[in-house]
Amino acid sequence: MTDIIATEVAPEAAEALAPVVRAPLGDRPIQTVGRRKEAIVRVRIVPGTGKITCNGRDLEAYFPSKVHQQLIKDPLVTTEKAEEFDVIANLRGGGTTGQAGALRLAIARALIASEPDDRPALKKAGFLTRDARAKESKKYGLKKARKAPQYSKR
């Protein structure tokens, strides 16, 4: 019986340890996650016509506010890929503003996964920064996080 010595590495095994280079996007969907406040968004982008779907509804139906629609489309407009990808988003938790911010972050991350050369433009515009602000917790003895009960001198 022959023992295999761990220090010996065959040339084929050395090649197997080389870093993996991903194939071009093709028809493979890219999945990313974005978070803001209490909102969590999972996004899949696939090559398409530029349609954005949120929880099975159209973007305009899910986010009636033009401000939120503009906020969400900004990464696609900045990279000039608004007509190249279809975005399918699963949104959970939070309110409309939190969900819109989380969706923008997820789309920006997905665009980088598809085309790493877009990173400097998205970074400069601030689309890759996770907004870490969250609601401050309420303290005992206070009415809210910082609001004290009314003070009566007498």
UniProtKB/Swiss-Prot annotation:
Family matches, as InterPro entries: Ribosomal_Su5_D2-typ_SF, Ribosomal_uS9, Ribosomal_uS9_bac/plastid, Ribosomal_uS9_CS, Ribsml_uS5_D2-typ_fold_subgr
Organism the protein comes from: Salinispora tropica (strain ATCC BAA-916 / DSM 44818 / JCM 13857 / NBRC 105044 / CNB-440)
SUPFAM superfamilies in the cross-refs: Ribosomal protein S5 domain 2-like
Residue ranges with Basic residues bias: 140-154
UniProt keyword Aminoacyl-tRNA synthetase, yes or no: no
GO cellular component, one term: small ribosomal subunit
Protein's name in the database: Small ribosomal subunit protein uS9
Ranges where the record places region Disordered: 133-154
Gene that this polypeptide is encoded by: rpsI
Gene3D superfamilies associated with the record: 3.30.230.10
Domain of life where this protein originates: Bacteria
